Amino acid sequence: MAAEDRVRWDEIYRTFARQPYPAPDPFLLEHTPIITTDTEYYALDLAGGMGQNGLWLAEQGYITDVMDISRVALYRARVEMTVRNLRNVNLLQVDIDTLDLHPYHYDIVCVFRYLRRDTLPAIRQAVKPGGRVIYESYNLEYLTHVPEFNTRFLLQHNELLDNFQGWEVVAHEEDEHITRLTAIRPEESESVVKARQEQYEQARQKADANTPEVEHKDDTFEW
């Protein structure tokens, strides 16, 4: 499925080749904290496409990972990075269906126009205590505009709220066919954070040890 998805999304993004580079999403601009210290802050633009949101975060001072399955989209992001002389962006071609994110790594995780429910636990764990998720995607009302759209990729009523229970909700909107959420992860003690990070590393090492070596051909890619 990953190979088919790569081909499909590459073809989609080729249709945008001659169009102007898109602007970042207004909801992201509204809910991104301003960096006021010399501390390093990290952001993830998940399923980021051509990177318009991730590059904007980088311009605000965040060290940003842009992850997408499409090499064509990431190439467009790379060109724009060069134009803007941005050096604090990592462009990562990944199969998001098998997403594996380090816990407590990002100050911001943003997701726009993308929904895979099995990625939500990884998104939650990747946000630092005090960090935030900024999420915007289509909900079931989108069927009134595109009746043939696959309902697997549409949010149910209050679904994002349910998935981020216990987080501080800064904003939640269900506006026509779009649902938006900004939520802040609760603070946790250093001992809890350290214990969970160690559990993650142990589980990952065990999984790596039990995975047979295979030859990879262009499965992942990093600029």
Segments (PLM) and residue ranges:
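Conserved SAM-binding strand-loop segment of SAM-dependent methyltransferases
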Residues: 85-96
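Conserved SAM/SAH-binding beta-strand->alpha-helix loop
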Residues: 70-72
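Conserved class I S-adenosyl-L-methionine
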Residues: 40-49
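S-adenosyl-L-methionine
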Residues: 1-38
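Conserved beta-strand signature within the Rossmann-like core of class I S-adenosyl-L-methionine
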Residues: 131-141
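A short acidic, Gly/Pro-enriched loop at the edge of an enzyme's catalytic core
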Residues: 99-108
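Core SAM-dependent methyltransferase catalytic element
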Residues: 174-223
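Conserved SAM-binding loop
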Residues: 77-78
